[in-house]
C-alpha cells in the first residue's frame, strides 16, 4: 500500500508538471503592468463624481487625480477593459491624488464578456483585499491564484471615514494565448488515429471548458472489445466513465467511475485533468482531486479509430448522437501531449470537425443574486390591466423556502404569489371575497440547478410550467378573471411597504435569477442597476454568487452534507462521530480510558486515533483485573485440523479481525504489551526441521511479512519454546514437532513481538505423508496498557519547550491534553504561519485562552474557571476549530464556542514548528506537567521528545492528588511513573478501583471463622496489613460493614467473639427486622432492633456499624440510627469473627444460640471489620490468612443471585420452642410442627409442665433482680408507645450477673 501511494504521489507530480508545461499561457515573467497605457475609454464605472471622469491609473495626478463615484456607497465599482483575455497575477491601489479619498478594503471580480461576473476567491472564499491608509501610498497584492479574463472590476467595501471613495489602480500580468473551440450543442470534433487501435498504458488528458447547459458529453472514445472512456456533464457535475476490463456493457446502464464538480453550468471556465497509469488514476476538476483504482484484467486502454469531442456520434448515421451533445466552449485540449484544437485549426488530416467554431461566443445573460433573506427584492414594472398574465424566469437556490414572485392584479383580480415551499413550487391567487386558486408542482427544486418557471393566465385558465415541460404543465381551470398589475416584486418585499402591493407569507428568496420575461418581454437588468428602471435592494446584479458548500464535502468520516444558501450542515448518524463536521469520535481511544471513566468489563468500540481517519474497532475490555486487557477476536479461534497439504499445495487459513490492518496497527502500537496464544499439534508433521532451511509451517504477520519463529522464541530466530527450556523431544531438533514421532506433540505459547502482530495467516505444507496429522489454534489478539494516556513530561523552566513538526490542520484542528501546575500563567502550545497562527495558554490562574487566526483576524475564546487551575491537580483542555465553529473546553466547565461567519471558511496555513510548553521566543513558557497530548486524534510522544531537550524531564508524579478518589471502598492510591494504581489490601473489594465486590453464597451449615492472632501476609510479598489487629489491643474506633441478601428470617449474619465471653451479633428477627445484640461488659447486654422493612426479601441490603467512643451509629441502607453508650463501655479484645453459623457454641448467648441453629442461608459481600476483610481472606488468601471455612462456600455475585438460588440452599430448622408468646422482633425461631399427632400431644404436655416450672423461677428471679437493677445507671427514657415494647431479657446462664436490655429504634 505504501509503495502504491508513493508511486501515485510521484505520478501526480510528474504528470501535473507535464500538463502545466503544455499550457501555452505559462509565463514565468508574468508581472507586467497592464492598465498604465490603456485609453481612458477602457475604464468604466458605476458613476463619476460631478459627472467628470479622470483616468484612474496608478500615480495619475492630472484632472481629478483618480476615480471617485457620485455617491459613496456599497453599489459602486470601477471596471477595466484589458482588450483581450490576459493572465492577471497582481493588483495595486492608491487613493485619489491630493484628497482624503481612499478605499480601505475592496473585492475583485473578473469576466470574459463584461457580464456574468465571477468573484475572485482565495482559500475557497470570496477574498477581501486590504486597501490604502492614505491617498499616495501604493498597496500591492500578489494573487495566490492568477485570473484569466478580459474585464476586471474593483468593488470598494470600506473607505476613509473622513472622506469618500477614491481609487487609482494597476493590474499586473501578461498576455494569455489559448486554443478555443465552440460547440453549439449539435456539433462534434473528431480526432482520428493513424492506426486502427490506440492502445495506451498511461494517459494524460487535460482541457478547460465553459458550459451553457448542465448536460453534455465533453469527449468519448471506445474500442470494439469493450474498453471505453467518456467524460460527461450531468446536471452540472462531471461524470467519468472508464473501463479496461473488456466488458461490453452499454454506456447508458453502467455507473460512472467518478463524479466531481458542481454548478459547472455557470458559464465560467473550469479545468479538467485525467491522469492514468495502468489501473491507478487521478481525476481533477478545478482544484478537487479524486484518486481511484480501475477494475480490469489488463492495464491497457484500447480505443479504436477515434476520439470524439462535444458528443458521441452514431456510426453510419450522420447527425445522430448517442447522448446529449455539449453546448459551450472547450480550451487547450491535450491528449497525451497532442494539442487537439491546434491540429483542428491547422486542418490536419487527423481532425474531422462538424459545425464548430474556433472562438467562444456566449449569450449576454445577466443573472442577479438575492443575498439577504430579510431585505432582498427586485421591483420590475409591467403593463397593467391586460386581460391575462405572462411571467417567466429561471432560478437556482439551496433554500427550501422563499418568495419568488408577488404582484397585485388589476380590476380586483386579487394577488398572485409564487412561493418555493419545502422545495416545491406553490402558485397562489388570493381573493378577498371568494376562494382563490392554488397550484403545486415539482419537488427538490432547491438542488442548486437552474430551473425555468412560466406562469400563463388566459381565458379562465392558469398554467404553471416547470423546466419547459410543456407536455405536462400544472393547470387550474377555475372561473377566474385575471388582469395584470403594474408592479412585479421578485424575491421579497420592501420593508416600508404597508399596502397589498406586495405580500410575503414566507421569508425572502436567497438565490439567483435570470432571463426574466414579463408579458413576453425581456427585462434589462442592467437598466435596473443603473437606476433607469424598477428598484432593488440587497442584490448582486450581473453575477450569480451561488456556492456549493458541500463540495468538497467537509463532513468527515462519511457524514452526509446538506446546505442552504448561507451554510452547510453535517448529518453524522451511524458514523460513530459527532460535532459540527463529524470530526469528534464518540468512542474512547483505549480500554484504559474507558476504565478511567468508570466503565466495567464488556464490549466497547475503541477509536485508536480519535478524530483521525481510522474508524472504530470493536474490542472486549476486561476491566476487572489490575491490567486492563483489550481483546480483539478473529474469525477462527477454535481448534482446527489441517487438511492434506504439501509444498505444491499448501494449506492456508486467513484471519479476519473485523477491521483494517491500519486499525489493528494503531491499536497495537498504542498498547504497552500485546500477545497472541499459538498452539500447534502435530503427529509425524514437521514444523521447522532446521533453523536455516525452509520451514514447513509459518505464519504471516503485520505488513504481510512471513515469520518462521514460534512461541517463546526470539523474533527472526527459527526456533520453538522447547529450545529455551531445553526440553525438546529430540535434542537434535528445534521444535517438538520436528521429532517426527508417531505420537501427538505440541508447541504452545505466546507471540508477543508487537511489530509482527497480529497473526493474519497460517500456512502448513507437511501433512501429506502416511499418518501425518496437524492441528492449530490461534487465540485472539490481547493487549494491555495505554502508552499515551499517561505519556507525561515536566517543564522546569520558562525557556524550555518541545518542538514537533508543523501541525497540519487546514480544515479541522483539535487539541487535547491534561496539565497540572502551580504557576500563574504560561503558554501550552503555539504554531505560527505567515499570517495564520494558533496559541493555547493559561493567561491567569483561573483563565484559559485559545487564540486562532486563519487570515481574517484573530478569534479569541476565553474560559474563566470558578476555581484556581494552578492547584497542582490534573485538569483537561480540549480546543477545536473547524469550518463551522471554534470551541474551547476546560474540565467539565461550560464550553466556550463561536460560530464561523458565512464567508469565513478559510484554511489554516501553519508553517513553523509546533512548540509545546513554550513559544518560539522562549518567553512565557509553561511550568508544570503535561500529558496525553493529542493533535487531531494523533498521539504525541512527549516522553521520547523530552529525552532530546533540556529543561524538560520525562514523567510526572503526583497523580494520586487528582485521582486518589477513584480508589474506592478503602483502597489506597499508589503512585507510578506512568499513572497510578489502587492497592485494595485494606478493602473488602478488589478490581482496578477496588469497586468489585467479593461475595459468596452460604448455606445453613456454612461458617467462615477469622481468628485474630498474629498479623498475616495477604499477598505473596512481604506486605503486611496496614492496620493489623493484635490479640491484646482494644481499638476505640470500630467499623463493621457488610452487604447481605437472604429470604430467611430469623438468621445470623455476623458474630464477633470478644474476650471474657463478650460478643456482638448481627441478626435478622422473625419479621425480618435488623437486630444488633451485644454484651460488652459483665453487667449488661443490649439488643437494638431497627424498625425497618422486612429485610429477608431477596434483595441486597447494606449494614454499616460505627463505634466512636461512646457513640454508636447503625446505618441500614439509607436509614441512620444513633445511640450513646455509657462512657465506661468499651469493646474488649477481639478473639474471632464468624460469618454464618457459629461452630464454637460454648458460652454462646442462649438467644443467639437459638438463631444460630438455623445458620445463614443467602449471600454476603463486602464484609469488613476495621481493615480486616474476612470473606476476602477466605476466598483469596485462605492459605495464608488465619481463616477457616466449614461447610459449602460458593463465590457468587449477590446482585446476580436470584430468589431461587437462595431458596435452593439447604436450610435447617430449629426444634426448640419459644418460651411463651414473644414479640416477633425477638430473634427466636419458629417451632417445627410434627406430622405425628402422638408426638404433638406428648410435646404439648411436656411444654405445659415446663411453663409451670419456668413461671415459678421467673417470679423468684424477678424479685431478686429488681433489687440489683435499682443500683444501675438509668438509660434514656423512651416514649410511652415504645414502653410496652421495652422489657428485660433473661439470660438463663448468668441470671445473677447481668441486666439485659432491648431497644426498638
UniProtKB/Swiss-Prot annotation:
Residues 30-174 form the F5/8 type C domain. Residues 1-24 form the signal peptide. Pfam families: F5_F8_type_C, Laminin_G_2. GO terms for cellular component: cell junction; membrane. It is a single-pass type I membrane protein. Residues 180-360, 367-544, 791-956, 1014-1198 form the Laminin G-like domain. Disulfide bonds join 30-174, 329-360, 512-544, 550-561, 555-570, 572-582, 929-956, 960-973, 967-982, 984-994, 1163-1198. Residues 1259-1305 are cytoplasmic. InterPro entries: ConA-like_dom_sf, EGF-like_dom, FA58C, Fibrinogen-like_C, Fibrinogen_a/b/g_C_dom, Galactose-bd-like_sf, Laminin_G, Neurexin-related_CASP. Residues 546-583, 957-995 form the EGF-like domain. Keywords: Cell adhesion, Disulfide bond, EGF-like domain, Glycoprotein, Membrane, Repeat, Signal, Transmembrane, Transmembrane helix. One of its GO terms (biological process) is cell adhesion. It is found in: Membrane. Glycans are attached at residues 282, 496, 571, 622, 1057. Its main location: membrane. PANTHER family: CONTACTIN-ASSOCIATED PROTEIN-LIKE 5, PIKACHURIN-LIKE PROTEIN. This is Contactin-associated protein like 5-4. It comes from Rattus norvegicus (Rat).
Amino acid at each position: 500500500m505504501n509503495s502504491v501511494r508513493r508511486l501515485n504521489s510521484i505520478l501526480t507530480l510528474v504528470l501535473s508538471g507535464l500538463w502545466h508545461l503544455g499550457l501555452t499561457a505559462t509565463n514565468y515573467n508574468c508581472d507586467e503592468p497592464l492598465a498604465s497605457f490603456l485609453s481612458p475609454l477602457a475604464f468604466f464605472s458605476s458613476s463619476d463624481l460631478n459627472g467628470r471622469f479622470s483616468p484612474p491609473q496608478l500615480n495619475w495626478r492630472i484632472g481629478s487625480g483618480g476615480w471617485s463615484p457620485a455617491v459613496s456607497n456599497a453599489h459602486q465599482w470601477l471596471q477595466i477593459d484589458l482588450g483581450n483575455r490576459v493572465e492577471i497575477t497582481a493588483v495595486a491601489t492608491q487613493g485619489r491624488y491630493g484628497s482624503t479619498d481612499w478605499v480601505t478594503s475592496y473585492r475583485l471580480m473578473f469576466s470574459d464578456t463584461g457580464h456574468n461576473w465571477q468573484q475572485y476567491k482565495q482559500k475557497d472564499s470570496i477574498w477581501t483585499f486590504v486597501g490604502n491608509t492614505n491617498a499616495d501610498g501604493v498597496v500591492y497584492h500578489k494573487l495566490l491564484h492568477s485570473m484569466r479574463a478580459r474585464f476586471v472590476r474593483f468593488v470598494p467595501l470600506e473607505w476613509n471615514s473622513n472622506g469618500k471613495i477614491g481609487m487609482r489602480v494597476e493590474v499586473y500580468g501578461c498576455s494569455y494565448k489559448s486554443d478555443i473551440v465552440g460547440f453549439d450543442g449539435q456539433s462534434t470534433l473528431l480526432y482520428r488515429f493513424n492506426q486502427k487501435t490506440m492502445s495506451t498504458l498511461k494517459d494524460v488528458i487535460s482541457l478547460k471548458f465553459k458550459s451553457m447547459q448542465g448536460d453534455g458529453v465533453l469527449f468519448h472514445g471506445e474500442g470494439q472489445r469493450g474498453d471505453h472512456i467518456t467524460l460527461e456533464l450531468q446536471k452540472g457535475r462531471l461524470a467519468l466513465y472508464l473501463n479496461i476490463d473488456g466488458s461490453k456493457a452499454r454506456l447508458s446502464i453502467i455507473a460512472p467511475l467518478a463524479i466531481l464538480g458542481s454548478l459547472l453550468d455557470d458559464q465560467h471556465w473550469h479545468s479538467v485533468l485525467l491522469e492514468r497509469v495502468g489501473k491507478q488514476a487521478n481525476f481533477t476538476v478545478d482544484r478537487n482531486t479524486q484518486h481511484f483504482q480501475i477494475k480490469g484484467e489488463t492495464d491497457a486502454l484500447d480505443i479504436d479509430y477515434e476520439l470524439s469531442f462535444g458528443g458521441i456520434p452514431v456510426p453510419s448515421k450522420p447527425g445522430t448522437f448517442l447522448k446529449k451533445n455539449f453546448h459551450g466552449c472547450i480550451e487547450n485540449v491535450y491528449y497525451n501531449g497532442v494539442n487537439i484544437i491546434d491540429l483542428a485549426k491547422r486542418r490536419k488530416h487527423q481532425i474531422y470537425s462538424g459545425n464548430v467554431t474556433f472562438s467562444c461566443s456566449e449569450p449576454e445573460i445577466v443573472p442577479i443574486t438575492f443575498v439577504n433573506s430579510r431585505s432582498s427584492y427586485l421591483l420590475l414594472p409591467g403593463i397593467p390591466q391586460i386581460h391575462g398574465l405572462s411571467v417567466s424566469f429561471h432560478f437556482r437556490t439551496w433554500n427550501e423556502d422563499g418568495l419568488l414572485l408577488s404582484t397585485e392584479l388589476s380590476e380586483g383580480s386579487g394577488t398572485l404569489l409564487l412561493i418555493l415551499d419545502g422545495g416545491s413550487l406553490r402558485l397562489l391567487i388570493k381573493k378577498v371575497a371568494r376562494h382563490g386558486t392554488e397550484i403545486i408542482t415539482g419537488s427538490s427544486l432547491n438542488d442548486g440547478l437552474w430551473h425555468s418557471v412560466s406562469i400563463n393566465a388566459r381565458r379562465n385558465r392558469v398554467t404553471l410550467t416547470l423546466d419547459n415541460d410543456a407536455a405536462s404543465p400544472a393547470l387550474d381551470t377555475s372561473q377566474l378573471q385575471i388582469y395584470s398589475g403594474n408592479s412585479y416584486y421578485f424575491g421579497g418585499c420592501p420593508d416600508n411597504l404597508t399596502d397589498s402591493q406586495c405580500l410575503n407569507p414566507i421569508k425572502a428568496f436567497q438565490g439567483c435569477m435570470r432571463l426574466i420575461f414579463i408579458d413576453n418581454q425581456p427585462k434589462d437588468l442592467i437598466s435596473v442597476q443603473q437606476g433607469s428602471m424598477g428598484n432593488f435592494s440587497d442584490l448582486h446584479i450581473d453575477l450569480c454568487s451561488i456556492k456549493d458548500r458541500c463540495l468538497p464535502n467537509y463532513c468527515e468520516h462519511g457524514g452526509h452534507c446538506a446546505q442552504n444558501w448561507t451554510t452547510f450542515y453535517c448529518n453524522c448518524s451511524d458514523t460513530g462521530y459527532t460535532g459540527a463536521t463529524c470530526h469528534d469520535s464518540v468512542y474512547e481511544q483505549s480500554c484504559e480510558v474507558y476504565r478511567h471513566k468508570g466503565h466495567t468489563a464488556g464490549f466497547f468500540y475503541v477509536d485508536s486515533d480519535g478524530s483521525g481517519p481510522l474508524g472504530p474497532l470493536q474490542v472486549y475490555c476486561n476491566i476487572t483485573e489490575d491490567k486492563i486487557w483489550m481483546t480483539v477476536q478473529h474469525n477462527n479461534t477454535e481448534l482446527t485440523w489441517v487438511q492434506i497439504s504439501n509444498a505444491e499445495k499448501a494449506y492456508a487459513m486467513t484471519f479476519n479481525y473485523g477491521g483494517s490492518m491500519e486499525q489493528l496497527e494503531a491499536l497495537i502500537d498504542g498498547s504497552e504489551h500485546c500477545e497472541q496464544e499459538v498452539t500447534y499439534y502435530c503427529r509425524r508433521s514437521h514444523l521447522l526441521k532446521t533453523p536455516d532451511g525452509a520451514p514447513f509451517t509459518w505464519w504471516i504477520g503485520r505488513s504481510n511479512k512471513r515469520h518462521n519463529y514460534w512461541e517463546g522464541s526470539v523474533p527472526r530466530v527459527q526456533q520453538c519454546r522447547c529450545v529455551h527450556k531445553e526440553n525438546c523431544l529430540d535434542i537434535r531438533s528445534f521444535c517438538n514437532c520436528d521429532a517426527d514421532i508417531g505420537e501427538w506433540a505440541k508447541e504452545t505459547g505466546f507471540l508477543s513481538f508487537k511489530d509482527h502482530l497480529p497473526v493474519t495467516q497460517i500456512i502448513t505444507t507437511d501433512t501429506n505423508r502416511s499418518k501425518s496429522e496437524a492441528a492449530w489454534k490461534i487465540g485472539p489478539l490481547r493487549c494491555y496498557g495505554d502508552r499515551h494516556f499517561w505519556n507525561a513530561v515536566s517543564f522546569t523552566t520558562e525557556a524550555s519547550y518541545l518542538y514537533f513538526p508543523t501541525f497540519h490542520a487546514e480544515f479541522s484542528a483539535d487539541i487535547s491534553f491534561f496539565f497540572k501546575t502551580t504557576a500563574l500563567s504560561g503558554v501550552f502550545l503555539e504554531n505560527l504561519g505567515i499570517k495564520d497562527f494558533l496559541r493555547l495558554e493559561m493567561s491567569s490562574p483561573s483563565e484559559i485562552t485559545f487564540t486562532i487566526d486563519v487570515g481574517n483576524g484573530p478569534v479569541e475564546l476565553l474560559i474563566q474557571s470558578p476555581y484556581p487551575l494552578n492547584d497542582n491537580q490534573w485538569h483537561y483542555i480540549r480546543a477545536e476549530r473547524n469550518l463551522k465553529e471554534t470551541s474551547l473546553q476546560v474540565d467539565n466547565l461550560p464550553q466556550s464556542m463561536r460560530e464561523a461567519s458565512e464567508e469565513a471558511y478559510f484554511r489554516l496555513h501553519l508553517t513553523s514548528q509546533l512548540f509545546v510548553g513554550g513559544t518560539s521566543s522562549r518567553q512565557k513558557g509553561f511550568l508544570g506537567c503535561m500529558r496525553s497530548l493529542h493533535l487531531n486524534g494523533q498521539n504525541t510522544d512527549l516522553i521520547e521528545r523530552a529525552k532530546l531537550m533540556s529543561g524538560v524531564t520525562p514523567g510526572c508524579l503526583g497523580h494520586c492528588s487528582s485521582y486518589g478518589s477513584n480508589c474506592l471502598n478503602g483502597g489506597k492510591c499508589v503512585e507510578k511513573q506512568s499513572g497510578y494504581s489502587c492497592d485494595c489490601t485494606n478493602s473488602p473489594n478488589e478490581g482496578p478501583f477496588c469497586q468489585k465486590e467479593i461475595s459468596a453464597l452460604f448455606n445453613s451449615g456454612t461458617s467462615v471463622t477469622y481468628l485474630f492472632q498474629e498479623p498475616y501476609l495477604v499477598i505473596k510479598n512481604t506486605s503486611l496489613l496496614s492496620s493489623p489487629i493484635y490479640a491484646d489491643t482494644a481499638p476505640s474506633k470500630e467499623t463493621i460493614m457488610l452487604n447481605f441478601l437472604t429470604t430467611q428470617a430469623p438468621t445470623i449474619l455476623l458474630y464477633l467473639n470478644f474476650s471474657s465471653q463478650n460478643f456482638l451479633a448481627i441478626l435478622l428477627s422473625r419479621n425480618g427486622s435488623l437486630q444488633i445484640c451485644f454484651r460488652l461488659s459483665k453487667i449488661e447486654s443490649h439488643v437494638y432492633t431497627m424498625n425497618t422493612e422486612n429485610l429477608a426479601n431477596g434483595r441486597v441490603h447494606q449494614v454499616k456499624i460505627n463505634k466512636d467512643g461512646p457513640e454508636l451509629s447503625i446505618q441500614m441502607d439509607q436509614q441512620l440510627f444513633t445511640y450513646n453508650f455509657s462512657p465506661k463501655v468499651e469493646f474488649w479484645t477481639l478473639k474471632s469473627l464468624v460469618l454464618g453459623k457459629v461452630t464454637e457454641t460454648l458460652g454462646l448467648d442462649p438467644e443467639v444460640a437459638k438463631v444460630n441453629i438455623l445458620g445463614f442461608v443467602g449471600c454476603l459481600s463486602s464484609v469488613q471489620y476495621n481493615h480486616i476483610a474476612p470473606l476476602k481472606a477466605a476466598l483469596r488468601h485462605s492459605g495464608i490468612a488465619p481463616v477457616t471455612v466449614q461447610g459449602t462456600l460458593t463465590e457468587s455475585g449477590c446482585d446476580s443471585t436470584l430468589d431461587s438460588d437462595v431458596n435452593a440452599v439447604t436450610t435447617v430448622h430449629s426444634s426448640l420452642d419459644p418460651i411463651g408468646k414473644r414479640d416477633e422482633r425477638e430473634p427466636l425461631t419458629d417451632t417445627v410442627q410434627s406430622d405425628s399427632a402422638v408426638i404433638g400431644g406428648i410435646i404439648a404436655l411436656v411444654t405445659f409442665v415446663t411453663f409451670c416450672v419456668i413461671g415459678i423461677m421467673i417470679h423468684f428471679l424477678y424479685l431478686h433482680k429488681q433489687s440489683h437493677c435499682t443500683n444501675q445507671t438509668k438509660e434514656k427514657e423512651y416514649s410511652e408507645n415504645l414502653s410496652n415494647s421495652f422489657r428485660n431479657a433473661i439470660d438463663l446462664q448468668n441470671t445473677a450477673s447481668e441486666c439485659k436490655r432491648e431497644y426498638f429504634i
